Regions:
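Functionally critical loop-and-helix segments that line ligand-binding/catalytic clefts
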Residues: 192
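Cell-wall glycan-active module
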Residues: 1-160, 165-181, 186, 196-294
Length: 294
């Protein structure tokens, strides 16, 4: 059965159930009819030691959320920092961050000392991702990942893998998959970790025996710091520094995609250099040039 045929039948089934007064799909696992479901289940069983019954049970009642596909298909938005910052630097957010820092001062200091990640960076991530926990998302994570894993062809395998990780996590921690909520793309908790990253980089920083990024700000602080440390964060190294440009075409050096940094040596030949001579940077260091002001 082709994927398009699957969704036609899925839609017809939804309409039929609604006609009988059922506002939501009630089959044990409607996604089991998708052509790739069997392979997904087999992969989940092999990767995490789950049984077929465990996978099917965790998927029971999963709902298709077609609006998520529409969100994913929207064109990406690229703004310079001076335009983008207004989304995050509202007075209410700043005050929420001040209160969060005061409340978790000891934990933030402990994480900085242990992992070498400055408190400001940890706070910045928490502020951007969830407004310091005030908005962790409202989509049922299982439903979001299933919708994307079986309906978003560009990254279907990635989201199926994350769905399998979610199911494994739910059994490991005794959490019902239907109770986990997060972003439309499946990210969870204060730091918006994808499910597969929770066992990889999550830290039980409050020492209660569980990694709980949904409810424990302390675990979230330690996990963010650990994540950055595991990804090569360099203690006491500069994060950013003012640069001087002596070339004639600034558009050629300003980063268009922050995921594609350039070696400093290349940018140096194009006229970029630190304004402060104390800053030491190697030609092989990967950097981005960003414009902070108009």
């Amino acid at each position: 059965m082709l994927k398009s045929d699957f969704y036609k039948k899925f839609k017809q089934l939804s309409i039929a159930l609604t006609a009988f007064g059922l506002s939501s799909l009630s089959l044990a696992n409607d996604f089991q009819y998708h052509p790739s479901y069997a392979a997904f289940k087999q992969n989940a069983m092999q990767s995490y030691g789950l049984s077929a019954q465990q996978v099917d049970s965790a998927m029971s009642g999963t709902r298709n959320l077609p609006n998520i596909i529409n969100i994913m298909n929207r064109p990406g938005e690229s703004k310079p920092w001076y335009s983008y910052k207004t989304n995050f630097l509202a007075e209410s957010t700043i005050q929420r961050g001040v209160r969060f820092k005061q409340q978790y001062a000891e934990t933030l200091n402990r994480a900085e000392q242990q992992f070498g990640v400055p408190q400001a960076i940890i706070l910045g991530i928490l502020g951007v991702e969830t407004g310091f926990g005030s908005n962790k998302g409202s989509f049922v994570t299982r439903d979001a990942l299933a919708t994307l894993g079986f309906g978003y062809e560009r990254r279907a395998q990635y989201f199926q893998d994350e769905l399998a990780a979610l199911i494994a996590w739910s059994y490991r921690d005794g959490v019902a998959t239907s109770s986990v909520v997060g972003s439309y793309a499946g990210a969870v908790g204060y730091p918006q970790f994808m499910p597969s990253n929770i066992p990889k980089f999550g830290v039980d920083y409050d020492g209660n025996g569980h990694i709980d990024l949904r409810n424990s700000a302390v675990d979230a602080i330690g996990s963010i710091a650990n994540y950055l440390a595991q990804h090569g964060w360099q203690r006491n190294q500069p994060i950013a520094f003012p640069a001087r440009y002596t070339g004639s075409n600034p558009d050629a050096v300003i980063a268009k995609d922050l995921t594609q940094p350039m070696p400093y040596g290349v940018l140096k030949t194009q006229g970029i250099s630190p304004m402060n001579p104390i800053v030491k940077i190697d030609d092989l260091d990967l950097v981005n040039v960003i414009q902070l002001k108009e």
